[in-house]
Design a protein with these regions (language model features):
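Donor-binding and catalytic core of enzymes assembling or modifying cell-surface/extracellular glycoconjugates
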Residues: 24-115
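A short, flexible beta-alpha/helix-coil linker loop
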Residues: 14-18
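Conserved hydrophobic helix-helix packing surfaces used for dimerization/oligomerization
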Residues: 9-11, 43
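Leloir-type glycosyltransferase catalytic cores
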Residues: 126-176
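Nucleotide-sugar donor-binding and catalytic loop/hinge architecture
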Residues: 1-9
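Short aromatic-enriched loop/helix-cap "lid" or pocket-rim segments at secondary-structure transitions
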Residues: 56-57, 123-124, 144
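Gly/Pro- and small hydrophobic-enriched strand-loop and loop-to-helix capping segments
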Residues: 105-133
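Glycine/threonine-rich flexible loop motifs
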Residues: 19-23
């Protein structure tokens, strides 16, 4: 089970909509880096029944089923997700509804923003730490990336860049 005295990461490793879901292998690698840096943190994957659950379990398998991941803990309703979000230390993953709930509960979050989403529009700017990475953070203004398709834009967001920025975010706000 979960020890509420220890830090908890809620990880949005998948999403309902494919176009809002970062590459699984990159997600698995990034969370593995997190586990190496913060082995004391307990991790809960946030997923809905059906396809999201299948995706979450596949990522868990790709990671080698680390003991830090409590794969069977799942919020079965929005109300349960709110209760869970009140207990976590931070959120990481795909930008989406779960991140909004976490933010409303006053918890910090770092997200990967889908190419179809405007980071400045969706990430709140208030006293709760919230940051993320979008393909537009990687490209320079002179590059012609608007013509790229969604997958090519997502490919610009490397696992190393996500880990470096997320790690800096954790340190900057003294989250762990």
């Amino acid at each position: 089970g979960i020890d509420l005295a220890k830090p908890i990461l809620l990880a949005g490793v998948t999403a309902k909509l494919d176009y809002k879901t970062w590459n699984e292998d990159r997600m698995a690698w990034t969370i593995q880096q997190f586990i190496k840096a913060y082995p004391q943190v307990q991790i809960i994957f946030n997923y809905a029944p059906g396809k999201e659950k299948e995706n979450a379990y596949r990522i868990y398998e790709k990671m080698g089923k680390p003991q830090q991941v409590h794969i069977d803990i799942a919020a079965k309703s929005q109300r349960e997700l709110v209760a869970l979000s009140n207990r976590i230390t931070l959120y990481f993953g795909n930008e989406g509804g779960g991140r909004h709930i976490v933010h409303a509960c006053g918890k910090p979050s770092f997200v990967i923003v889908a190419p179809t989403t405007n980071k400045k529009t969706w990430l709140p700017q208030n006293d709760v730490p919230a940051d993320g990475i979008a393909y537009t953070d990687i490209t320079n203004q002179d590059s012609d990336t608007e013509a790229l398709d969604r997958l090519a834009k997502y490919a610009l967001i490397t696992k190393e860049e996500v880990w470096n920025r997320w790690s800096d975010f954790i340190k900057r706000y003294h989250i762990l």
